[in-house]
């Protein structure tokens, strides 16, 4: 069962609560089921790196919600897929928290996105209170850029617990953000495919 890092019935976030309730339902029905809790997942079609890279195309600045201090441990979609395949053979009733090899602050992730897309944008600190007010209006839209529940999630770090079972316990070496994200963020670079080719050439020459 694929859940999410931060699943918690006591959370202020509806998303975190529903994920925890899903885990409980699975455990009650299948006591030996394996539960996987990934941090934010990255890959060519992800909803994090692609979203902010797209926003940087037309916004003069990007918001650092809560000052940009929230920590994340992004995990590669390919590693999550491998974890699912291995979990299907185990049925040991354990919960595994899935995170990549490095932890980044929200600010550091936005800086990485801007660097890889060749964009210069101001990063403006936005207190949680103001972010909540903005989200209240934005979430009225059909495809909101921000919701109140997302702001609530950003109040808590999204990293693997040092005592939790993880990718290593499944025999998986985590893939870094830097090894994958540049291969698809070139689409958002002002120079497009040319910038992507240059990046690949530099990586191959190292």
Which residue ranges define each predicted feature?
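Conserved Rossmann-fold NAD(P)-dependent oxidoreductase catalytic core, especially the SDR/UDP-sugar
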Residues: 1-29, 33-39
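A conserved pocket-lining segment of Rossmann-fold NAD(P)-dependent short-chain dehydrogenase/reductase
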Residues: 54-75, 79-99
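Flexible, glycine-rich beta-alpha linker
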Residues: 13-14, 34-55, 70-71, 77-78, ...
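Hydrophobic residues at beta-strand termini and immediately following loops
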Residues: 36, 64-65, 98, 126, ...
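Low-complexity, charge- and small-residue-enriched intrinsically disordered regions
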Residues: 60-77, 138-162
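Generic structural signal for helix capping and beta-alpha/helix-loop junctions
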Residues: 8-9, 43, 131
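Mid/C-terminal beta-alpha module of Rossmann-like enzyme folds, strongest
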Residues: 84-147, 161-206
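Acceptor/aglycone-binding surface of glycosyltransferases and processive sugar-polymer synthases
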Residues: 13-20, 44-62, 107-108, 120-121, ...
């Amino acid at each position: 069962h694929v859940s999410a890092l931060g699943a918690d019935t006591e959370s202020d976030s509806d998303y975190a609560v529903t994920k925890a309730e899903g885990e409980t339902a699975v455990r009650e029905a299948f006591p030996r089921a394996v539960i996987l809790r990934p941090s934010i997942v990255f890959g060519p079609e992800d909803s994090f790196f692609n979203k902010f890279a797209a926003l940087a195309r037309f916004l003069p600045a990007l918001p650092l919600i809560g000052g940009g201090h929230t920590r994340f441990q992004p995990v590669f979609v390919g590693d999550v897929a491998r974890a699912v395949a291995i979990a299907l053979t185990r049925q040991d009733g354990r919960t595994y928290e899935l995170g990549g090899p490095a932890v980044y602050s929200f600010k550091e992730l936005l800086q990485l996105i801007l660097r890889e897309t060749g964009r210069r944008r101001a990063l403006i600190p936005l207190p949680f209170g103001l972010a909540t007010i903005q989200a209240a209006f934005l979430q009225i839209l059909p495809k909101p850029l921000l919701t109140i529940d997302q702001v609530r999630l950003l109040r808590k770090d999204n990293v693997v617990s040092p005592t939790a079972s993880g990718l290593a316990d499944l025999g998986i070496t985590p893939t870094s953000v830097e090894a994958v994200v540049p291969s698809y963020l070139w689409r958002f670079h002002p120079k497009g495919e040319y910038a992507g080719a240059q990046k690949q050439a530099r990586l191959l020459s190292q």
